[in-house]
Amino acid sequence: MTSSDYDPASEGAETDFSRRMSYGDYLALDAILGAQHPLSEAHDEMLFIIQHQTTELWMRLAIHELSAARRAIARDEVQPAMKMLARMSRIFEQLNNAWDVLRTMTPSEYTRFRSQLGQSSGFQSRQYRLIEYLLGNRNHAMLKPHAHDAEVTKLLEAELATPSLYDEVLRLADRNGLTMPAAVLSRDVRETHSFNEGVLQAWRVVYEAPETHWMLYELAEKLVDFEDYFRRWRFNHVTTVERVIGFKRGTGGTGGVSYLKRMLEVELFPELWRVRTIL
């Protein structure tokens, strides 16, 4: 028998799904594969749509993992949280690799359908904004693009009222023997955490004696590992946009590359990066 003659039913594989849930049913593939609606005849618009749709799917998983990691840390369940953070790094490794596919589209090819995008832009992504808020970058101005959608605004406002992932990590560290500044522990969580010398010195204790504070040391390195991948994703976003549109304004009205470059300056866990300088 050749492979072309092989019938999986001969070994007991199920082939009748008239009354059973199939692979496509479970994954709702009809809905997913029917969600691409190019607005032009340009061949490369399909690539552009699928690139962004798959990014949104990975972000859906990222939110799932980050939210669970934050809950686990708040309950002192650090080992499961570290597994989730490790997965977050792999998710953003996947997202970084995806830029290579989009870079196969040239400026000439993009201009054939760019006008069809109207004012839509990636900075309007509600999931990306939720990830930024979860991680502690709490720019209230970024609520404005969602003001037309009451449900999304409610979701983002609720996240702003919740301690960020890093807030929970600092509280965990305080519960486990590090002395975190009271002003940091009691701060308004709706605002972005800014660098604090007391937090830096607390992490210095961990990094100067990792064997004594192994759990916190390992957790800190998981955070740094993740932010490393996240920074690379932002950088790849900048270089891809510059490669495709140069320094034109973004479709959403931002400065395009100049806006994205400002995002490269954002530090999610500033003390974990600066502690390396003082060791």
UniProtKB/Swiss-Prot annotation:
Residues reported to bind heme: 237
UniProt keywords, alphabetically: Dioxygenase, Heme, Iron, Metal-binding, Oxidoreductase, Tryptophan catabolism
Catalytic activity: L-tryptophan + O2 = N-formyl-L-kynurenine
EC numbers: 1.13.11.11
Annotated residues for binding of substrate: 48-52, 110, 114, 251
Pathway: Amino-acid degradation; L-tryptophan degradation via kynurenine pathway; L-kynurenine from L-tryptophan: step 1/2
Cofactor note: Binds 1 heme group per subunit.
The keyword Metal-binding appears for this protein: yes
GO molecular function: heme binding; metal ion binding; tryptophan 2,3-dioxygenase activity
Gene Ontology BP annotations: L-tryptophan catabolic process to acetyl-CoA; L-tryptophan catabolic process to kynurenine
The organism's place on the tree of life at top rank: Bacteria
Enzyme class: oxidoreductase
InterPro entries per UniProt: Trp/Indoleamine_2_3_dOase-like, Trp_2-3-dOase_bac, Trp_2_3_dOase
Essential cofactor(s): heme
UniProt function note: Heme-dependent dioxygenase that catalyzes the oxidative cleavage of the L-tryptophan (L-Trp) pyrrole ring and converts L-tryptophan to N-formyl-L-kynurenine. Catalyzes the oxidative cleavage of the indole moiety.
PANTHER family on file: TRYPTOPHAN 2,3-DIOXYGENASE
Family stated for the protein in its record: Belongs to the tryptophan 2,3-dioxygenase family.
Assembly and oligomerization: Homotetramer.
UniProt-recorded name of the protein: Tryptophan 2,3-dioxygenase
